[in-house]
């Protein structure tokens, strides 16, 4: 018997069986193959038959000759892989520094240092064939997890990662939104007369890419979510 295709596949595989009736030891002519009974019970007349499967395993075919004798052929199929691989990824400091690593998905991630992608994948069948990532509206790009993408330019970007296995199955896409902002915020001020002889300090700030998170006043109090303060 033969199995087609004979390489890893994520689709069905066809078992092709051919049978012969050997010459008896007593010298008489063999009676010839009458039929082949398929694993699902279907009887096919003649000495050849095909059977399609979608799951790995052992499949039994019963060969019957015209004399009523039978033999069982055990056909092995082990190259079907219909399971999707899995992938996870996160970002780590490019310099290997001791910083908090974000592993959860779903929230925008803020970084003020160069980062490198850390991706890992798993597959229960044919094995991982390739890793791919996409930044923003860009094209899918193949990468080596041993030499992963690095991000050193300031940007706000949506990163998506997926993997393929040898059989052609693709994983669920995993995504992260990152803000890479390495520029410290700047501030400027003006002075204007206030009440009771006091002076107002009018503070304006620029938070570059990610904006200003907070302003700490001289007395230690903190104002959140503003970029100007009097």
PLM regions: where:
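Low-complexity, disordered linker/stalk regions enriched in Pro/Thr/Ser/Gly
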Residues: 1-230
